[in-house]
Amino acid sequence: MPVKIIDHVYAQYLLTQLRNRNTKGIDFRKGLVRLGRIVGYELVRYFPTREVEVETPLGKAVGIEILGLDKVIIVQILRAAMPFVEGLLKAFPQARLGVIAARRKEEGGVVDVEVFYSKIPTVEREDIVIVADPMLATGITMTRAIEEVYRVGQPGRLIVVSVIATPVGIERVLSKYPETEIFVVAIDPTLNDKAFIVPGLGDAGDRAFST
């Protein structure tokens, strides 16, 4: 299961609101937070569980424990991922946080990415690293981010979460890091000449922060 589309009805509703060009500023940002929460809850479905017995005030009950919640590291790619990760943290409140700052470079019509800041917690073999970026467009930024994760350590699981991805971005990530699990809310068909996803939702960072 390298790629999973999150088809939860509320996630698809929120995506529609984010795509709408008339959704402005704070509403866009709040939408990313809400969507991050839903995506987080969907991710938890793919965590292992075990049966446990607990004492209630009136007796005993059998339930489940979710394994690995205390081993999650969320790495956010600034700045569009900030509200998205705020939502993810509702599902993973114990997560440790890492930050990567990157900028696009265009030279001679070629788009590249430069990572100019990276601060990631120590990664151990039992850890689950979630790399979050709302837009998985060319996949260049994401592969750079994964490189930074592996500089720190080798996780047990590597998960990429995005709102919208393209086949190009997915292929670039999986061709270099086939062990990656990718969760997205939608896959859009193409990129324009500026490497933005079409139809996409525009520049997520600019729209979230009204810049």
UniProtKB/Swiss-Prot annotation:
UniProt cofactor note: Binds 1 Mg(2+) ion per subunit. The magnesium is bound as Mg-PRPP.
E.C. numbers: 2.4.2.9
Segments crossing the lipid bilayer: none
GO BP of this protein: UMP salvage; uracil salvage
Activity-regulation annotation: Allosterically activated by GTP.
Chain sites annotated for binding 5-phospho-alpha-D-ribose 1-diphosphate: R79, R104, D133, P134, M135, L136, A137, T138, G139, I140, T141, D203
The keyword Iron-sulfur is annotated on this UniProt entry: no
GO molecular function, one term: GTP binding
Associated pathway: Pyrimidine metabolism; UMP biosynthesis via salvage pathway; UMP from uracil: step 1/1
UniProt: GTP binding residues: K30, G31, L32, V33, R34
Cofactors that this protein relies on: Mg(2+)
Record field: catalytic activity: UMP + diphosphate = 5-phospho-alpha-D-ribose 1-diphosphate + uracil
Coiled-coil stretches noted in the UniProt entry, renumbered to this chain: none
Entries under SUPFAM superfamilies matching the protein: PRTase-like
Residues that hold uracil according to the record: I197, G202, D203, A204
Entry keyword set: Allosteric enzyme, Glycosyltransferase, GTP-binding, Magnesium, Nucleotide-binding, Transferase
Role according to the record: Catalyzes the conversion of uracil and 5-phospho-alpha-D-ribose 1-diphosphate (PRPP) to UMP and diphosphate.
Family statement: Belongs to the UPRTase family.
NCBIfam families assigned to the protein according to its UniProt record, in alphabetical order: PRK00129.1, upp
Protein name: Uracil phosphoribosyltransferase
UniProt gene name: upp
